[in-house]
Amino acid sequence: MASERQKKIRNFCIIAHIDHGKSTLADRLLEMTGVLTEREMEDQVLDTMEIERERGITIKAQAVRMVYKAKDGEEYILNLIDTPGHVDFNYEVSRSLAACEGAILVVDAAQGIEAQTLANVYLALDHDLEILPVINKIDLPSAQPDVVKKEIEDVIGLDASEAPLISAKNGINIEAVLESVVKNVPPPEGDENAPLRALIFDSYYDSYKGVIVYIRVKEGTLKLGDKVRMMYTNKEFTVTEIGYMKPGGLVPGTQLSAGEVGYFAASIKNVKDTRVGDTVTTADNPAKEPLPGYKKVNPMVFCGIYPADGSKYGDLRDALEKLQLNDASLTFEPESSVALGFGFRCGFLGLLHMEIIQERLEREFDFDLVTTAPSVIYKVTKTNGETLYIDNPTNLPPPAEIKTMEEPIVKATIMTPTEYVGNIMELAQERRGIYKDMTYIDEGRVMLTYELPLNEIIYDFFDALKSRTKGYASLDYEMLGYRESDLVKLDIMLNGEIVDALSFIVHREKAYARGRRIAEKLKEAIPRQQFEVPIQACIGGKIIARETVKAYRKDVLAKCYGGDITRKKKLLEKQKEGKKRMRQIGTVEVPQEAFMSVLKLDT
């Protein structure tokens, strides 16, 4: 049973599809409960990174404490845990949800339910959260609250008859949301006197205090000065500061008890010691079991990142280390390429994560970067029975040693207006998709389920999906596992030399078309030399496509007026010999633009 103190606490989060008004609603709740004065208000208070605001997405989880005086005259402590909404950060979302008892589901009155809304709702249901539907943007002329209510009931199976109709932008009916939280979200439970068990749902690095760890205390009490142990990493630290969060700052206190959400600092030097999902307990009276649900997050998408200016290699390492302080899911290791020099092989949770890291490197650290084509992890079984996981095409063993190759497969859920179903099916087939299911949500919208290779999604599937549906379709995907596939390594040779940065692993059916396109693109991008340069795409020893960059040549016959043909032949032969010798000793400089144009190929 919840104690008297716990009965006054509500821990909840807000889940929504991108652009349905999650951050705006959070702003209004903060304003309504007086956490922020109007002067302090700026849009999307909880999205602290510039990129978060620009793209209108939430990347890092945040947490805020509000005090609200309800209509029943009691004061309640409301802890809002802001979650990322994007599929790449799915694990972070699941840990943030595990720190709550309830979730506000924000649905746009004009758009209805979207793919990511569904994905997050299912996650919330997995954690047994009380879900409160809220219909936002009712001030829009195209709003259809009744249709959306019916959609919520039909698709998710939630009773939406009581759902507050609000406009977060104009501050309409916000109080109804707070009342609904107080009334419907169950208070936290947990014995304050039991051994401490607290869930880490986020952490970030502060250059003065070390790592600041965000926790939800499930059982027991954590006090200032306690010696704590992380149950998965087994590291021990002494708490130097403890308290709760408010926008733009921390409020130090003396202790956190079961049911509360707060933070602590303990002079921790590395974010890797405070893994999201880990359990914190005290060293002198440890809990027997950690909290369930911890997973080590593994990167899914890899690419090489190189500084355009080779002398900046050291600076790039420093920048990646700084980003890693706040982002334990980013991995990188040094690699070198004949074509691009020294750089790093970086691992990311997904495409959005990769784009954000690249953008932050370019924006916050002012780098000019060259990135190689993204690749996924392939599972290779060799003829001697050994299993390898390959994230870089250059590490692939020779074809004779490979018994089977498997690639990661995802389950993709696509929501679309009915008129675009044909286009989407065509796109999914082009990308080797396997059709699984199709459900009509209402007269105008359909939910399609496909199994697709991750390799086909990571280039530009999302862009292609948007362009074929005029921007109306939404996509969500989750990992299914590995499946055997007929994959080959496609190498590009310039002047007989393999260019390592342009190697790809590709499905055999697509290899010819891909090789042909790359060769054509390189032919346009590589400047002419004094000798002719053959560009060849090959699989193993077999050339599947070839283009030639023609040589510049001097007109050696200009000074021959008439005269014997053998004289002309002699001069041409001599020129040919010279070009041949030049070609043997010449090297081809590949300009940066040539790499970029190949990597931007529509795949």
From Swiss-Prot:
The keyword Calcium does not apply. Coiled coil: none annotated. Pfam families: EFG_C (PF00679), GTP_EFTU (PF00009), GTP_EFTU_D2 (PF03144), LepA_C (PF06421). InterPro entries: EF-4, EFG_III/V, EFG_V-like, EFTu-like_2, G_TR_CS, LepA_C_sf, LepA_CTD, LepA_IV. GO terms for molecular function: GTP binding; GTPase activity; ribosome binding; translation elongation factor activity. It comes from Acetivibrio thermocellus (strain ATCC 27405 / DSM 1237 / JCM 9322 / NBRC 103400 / NCIMB 10682 / NRRL B-4536 / VPI 7372) (Clostridium thermocellum). It catalyses: GTP + H2O = GDP + phosphate + H(+). GTP binds at D19, H20, G21, K22, S23, T24, N136, K137, I138, D139. Residues 7-189 form the tr-type G domain. The lineage of its organism: Bacteria, Bacillati, Bacillota, Clostridia, Eubacteriales. Its main location: membrane. It is found in: Cell membrane. It comes from the Bacteria. GO terms for biological process: positive regulation of translation. Belongs to the TRAFAC class translation factor GTPase superfamily. Classic translation factor GTPase family. LepA subfamily. SUPFAM superfamilies: EF-G C-terminal domain-like (SSF54980), P-loop containing nucleoside triphosphate hydrolases (SSF52540), Translation proteins (SSF50447). CDD domains: EF4_II, EF4_III, LepA, lepA_C. This is Elongation factor 4. It is a peripheral membrane protein. Keywords: Cell membrane, GTP-binding, Hydrolase, Membrane, Nucleotide-binding, Protein biosynthesis.
